[in-house]
UniProtKB/Swiss-Prot annotation:
Residues 1-263, 311-391 are cytoplasmic. Residues 285-289 are lumenal. The chain crosses the membrane at residues 264-284, 290-310. The modification N-acetylmethionine is found at residue 1. PANTHER family: HOMOCYSTEINE-RESPONSIVE ENDOPLASMIC RETICULUM-RESIDENT UBIQUITIN-LIKE DOMAIN MEMBER 1 PROTEIN (PTHR12943:SF7), HOMOCYSTEINE-RESPONSIVE ENDOPLASMIC RETICULUM-RESIDENT UNIQUITIN-LIKE DOMAIN HERPUD PROTEIN FAMILY MEMBER (PTHR12943). This is Homocysteine-responsive endoplasmic reticulum-resident ubiquitin-like domain member 1 protein. It comes from Pongo abelii. Residues 10-72 form the Ubiquitin-like domain.
Length: 391
């Protein structure tokens, strides 16, 4: 019985989370309860915290008042580190506490660490308790910026004042990150050309030829007849590239001569496609249908390549083929009095070409529509041949 009542001394090192005070080392008994230890700390701790306001943490666990130190502290260690979290009595004493902390910074920061090397693992817990201490009822009377500033000033000399627990710094960092992300997104979209508006009107770039200098007063205005019905002259640039076509993405595309200069691979592909078509038609149809389709296909192919035209193509007059037509408004010698237009004298005299054109503009007939459907169907089965080149 005497061995059970014999006191078991133990050394306790009580640390404050915000480093307002030095680490307090005291001697106790393993038979003490946590409530007895809190009552002892209320007498020896500098701020004299009440037992109900104290929170003791050991190895990351919150100690309850009814627990015994014998069950919590291992016997292999002689010094045990406890973290004390308590409320502040009055905010008016904060300047005095800050002055004491400033005096303690003059001493080397590593003195306590060299004395107790096993306490290095508790530094992270010390920082985590800062935020918990800010939420206590003692800080409710202080505004948020002042509370954050006082908490940062209360950190030890080994810690920076710009900790990641400040809500002001967190909001500022979030704004900077959002701005940088937005600028990177704008730069990426501008580099990819997503914001480039499409051209309103697709125009073909025309190579402008140097125009000769105009002669001053070459045709006086009094010698020119007043022709109000003259059509505007269309200026055709002979130096422009005639092989340009419009591009769906914007800008011109130069026609290439791939359709004319075909290699053996293109001809082999066309022959293989046509042979597959013939085999399907031959094996899944009769001989008469096969001959009919073959004949129509040959006729359509000859018409498509230009060997078997149904009507002559109109000859296109290019600007380089002959001199430009005479302009009525530019007749300085009044040669218009030599004769009048035969069409104006005889309204019954109509050229035969005009009658043909008027007949074509009336509308397609049923036969022409049926022929167009037949031609389009069989032309889609054949590969596209080289275009006819006008002489």
């Amino acid at each position: 019985m005497e061995s059970e009542t014999e006191p078991e001394p133990v050394t306790l090192l009580v640390k404050s989370p915000n480093q307002r005070h030095r680490d307090l080392e005291l001697s106790g008994d393993r038979g003490w309860s946590v409530g007895h230890l809190k009552a002892h700390l209320s007498r020896v701790y500098p701020e004299r915290p009440r037992p109900e306001d104290q929170r003791l943490i050991y190895s990351g666990k919150l100690l309850l008042d009814h627990q015994c130190l014998r069950d919590l502290l291992p016997k292999q260690e002689k010094r045990h580190v406890l973290h004390l979290v308590c409320n502040v009595k009055s905010p008016s004493k904060m300047p005095e506490i800050n002055a004491k902390v400033a005096e303690s910074t003059e001493e080397p920061a590593g003195s306590n660490r060299g004395q107790y090397p096993e306490d290095s693992s508790s530094d992270g817990l010390r920082q985590r308790e800062v935020l918990r201490n800010l939420s206590s009822p003692g800080w409710e009377n202080i505004s948020r910026p002042e509370a954050a500033q006082q908490a940062f000033q209360g950190l030890g000399p080994g810690f920076s004042g710009y900790t990641p627990y400040g809500w002001l710094q967190l909001s500022w960092f979030q704004q900077i990150y959002a701005r940088q992300y937005y600028m990177q997104y704008l730069a990426a979209t501008a580099a990819s050309g997503a914001f480039v508006p499409p051209p309103s009107a697709q125009e073909i770039p025309v190579v402008s030829a140097p125009a000769p200098a105009p002669i001053h007063n070459q045709f006086p205005a009094e010698n020119q007849p007043a022709n109000q019905n003259a059509a505007p002259q269309v200026v055709v640039n002979p130096g422009a590239n005639q092989n340009l076509r419009m591009n769906a993405q914007g800008g011109p595309i130069v026609e290439e001569d791939d359709e004319i200069n075909r290699d053996w691979l293109d001809w082999t592909y066309s022959a293989a496609t046509f042979s597959v078509f013939l085999s399907i038609l031959y094996f899944y149809s009769s001989l008469s249908r096969f001959l009919m389709v073959m004949g129509a296909t040959v006729v359509m192919y000859l018409h498509h390549v230009g060997w078997f035209p149904f009507r002559p193509r109109p000859v296109q007059n290019f600007p380089n083929d002959g001199p430009p037509p005479d302009i009525v408004n530019q007749d300085p010698n009044n040669n218009l009095q030599e004769g009048t237009d035969p069409e104006t004298e005889d309204p019954n005299h109509v050229p035969p070409d005009r009658g043909v054109l008027d007949g074509e503009q009336t509308g397609p007939s049923f036969m022409s529509t049926a022929w167009l459907v037949f031609k389009t169907f069989f032309a889609s089965l054949l590969p596209e041949g080289p275009p006819a080149i006008a002489n």
